């Protein structure tokens, strides 16, 4: 009997796969547990509609990530860090970068950063993971504050 899976089933297939199984297995195990449905024209139409919507959502998310990449790479973030005798007093962390980015209308999330960041003086290039293979390079500039602390 040909069926369409409603959920992932171990050793059988993934959701929306069309598989051939024995009648008893389908009728007594898969159908009662709502793991599968008989292969009908309606089931095939639902499957095709779902896969089409999933592909459209994927393309939409990919396009948004590409736009965000362009904005991130054109927008450097600049911080002022206190100093004492020319040495940095503290450091810039991921949370501060995210907050400044939000003020500049960049929607960065913590999971985009590969590691926790602690930056000192200078220009730093951070690689952000946006979407699957799409990465962006964020420029963060940390300048010493004009006054010194004692």
UniProtKB/Swiss-Prot annotation:
InterPro entries: Ribosomal_bL9, Ribosomal_bL9/RNase_H1_N, Ribosomal_bL9_bac/chp, Ribosomal_bL9_C, Ribosomal_bL9_C_sf, Ribosomal_bL9_N, Ribosomal_bL9_N_sf
GO BP: any one term: translation
Keywords associated with the record: Ribonucleoprotein, Ribosomal protein, RNA-binding, rRNA-binding
GO terms for cellular component: cytosolic large ribosomal subunit
UniProt GO MF annotations: rRNA binding; structural constituent of ribosome
Primary role: Binds to the 23S rRNA.
Entry's family note: Belongs to the bacterial ribosomal protein bL9 family.
Protein name: Large ribosomal subunit protein bL9
Naturally occurring in which organism (per UniProt): Mycoplasma genitalium (strain ATCC 33530 / DSM 19775 / NCTC 10195 / G37)
